[in-house]
Amino acid sequence: MSAGREQFVRRMRASRSAGDAFDVVLQRGTELGFQFCAYRLTAPIPITRRRTFVWSNYPNACAASPVLDADRSGRGADTDAQACGVTADATQVFESMADGLWAETSDQGVRYGWALSVRDRWGAVGTLKFARGTREIVQEELDDIEPEMIWLAHLAHDTIGSLMRDETIPGEIARVSLVERQILLWTAEGKTVSEISSILQMSVRNINFHIQNVVGKLGATNKTHAAVKATLVGLIPV
């Protein structure tokens, strides 16, 4: 790792809050030639009401946009987890005038940009966007700066995701035991309690005991719901 990257990593690791970490990324984005930066973190659960946190220096007029959900405080909530417009680990270069998804931001000076979404082992998705109002991103420039932006997106998600873990992943999830994860794995495979008992060589009574415990830890209503939530937060497969 270069000395410059090592220094940047130290600054990120020294961040005491997600907002502090975002400010470090914002500064680097400016150095790369972008006026605007936004980072969006979407929690994996609740499944139908996923919480979203956004840090941004986008114009205030864009704050109401369901696409950007730009809230500098980081406390904005948007239940549309697909609004980021990109899939995990796939970069997107956009021109707002040409792309309906971003068109409403062009009048606010946000026209050309780049975005990447990263999904972590807990199922949380972080989307980093860099944008500017003038000068299209040409291939020559992209070849030069995209490796750095991809690295920034992963580092931003690693840092901000960790700082926001208590907000995105309920603490009880970390206490799910290996046996409970194995039971949920076989539940997800459609096995009955009796079949799981035979597979794990445990009594039906013990299986039911562990199911009751893990359903409570995951805040689920039944074992099927627990298996779905466990899959989304990366607890299974084991």
Curated annotation (Swiss-Prot):
GO biological process, one term: regulation of DNA-templated transcription
Highest taxon of source: Bacteria
The keyword Translocase is annotated on this UniProt entry: no
InterPro entries: Sig_transdc_resp-reg_C-effctor, TF_LuxR_autoind-bd_dom, TF_LuxR_autoind-bd_dom_sf, Tscrpt_reg_LuxR_C, WH-like_DNA-bd_sf
Knockout consequences: No production of thailandamide antibiotic. When the promoter region is disrupted (121 bases before the start codon) thailandamide production increases. In 2 other promoter disruption mutants (617 and 624 bases before the start codon) this bacterium no longer inhibits growth of Salmonella in an overlay assay, suggesting no thailandamide is produced.
Coiled-coil zones: none
DNA-binding feature ranges: 193-212
Domain HTH luxR-type: start-end pairs: 169-234
GO molecular function (one): DNA binding
Pfam families: Autoind_bind, GerE
Keywords of this entry: DNA-binding, Transcription, Transcription regulation
Annotated family: Belongs to the autoinducer-regulated transcriptional regulatory protein family.
Note: Thailandamide is a polyketide that is toxic to human cell lines but also has antibacterial activity on E.coli, S.typhimurium and S.aureus. It probably acts on acetyl-CoA carboxylase in the fatty acid synthesis pathway, which is rarely found to be an antibiotic target. These data suggest it might be a good starting point for engineering of novel antibiotics.
Biological function: Represses thailandamide production.
Name the record gives this protein: Transcriptional repressor ThaA
Gene coding for it: thaA
